[in-house]
Amino acid sequence: ALPEDSTFPLLVPRGFADRMAKGDPHDPLLRQVWPERSESVMQADELSDPVGDLSARKAPGLLQKYHGRALVVATGACAVHCRYCFRRHYPYADDTAAAAGWRGAVELIRADHSIHEVILSGGDPLSLADHKLAELTDALSDIPHVRRLRIHSRLPIVLPERVDAGLLAWLRGLPWPVALVVHAN
């Protein structure tokens, strides 16, 4: 049975679930998404923000941990709740670039000439519609010191149909070298 008090409930696309071995509680695909009761108990050595995102926040939806690059939390939406997600406690409702209309994040990137690489992350940025992705990257394309784009996504693995003609056309039309970092197990 699923834990009743899960703040990070089971969420998995049907196509990904269809690839799981039915009746096998040890199936590796199932283990990636199945909530365990122990997850709701914070251990003494655990952190709710294990990668320091909140201390790296520069504006709503903009994180900067390293010189030369900035991470845009493009959305809090994701097609799957992976049990190992290090942003499960991230305050997406209050702190995404989309919630702020991109403007603040884009303007801070524009003002910081040391930023040459922008990372789109989230949630999962490919959860956004193509026109929303284009809206964000169009705003970023006006910044001459941005020279590279990275997109971090799990959707090509759990929802491969998201990689469609529209998404590929958007990717081909981007003015920078693009690295699509696919989160796979």
Where are these regions (language model features)?
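Short pre-active-site segment immediately N-terminal to redox-active cysteine/selenocysteine motifs
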Residues: 77-81
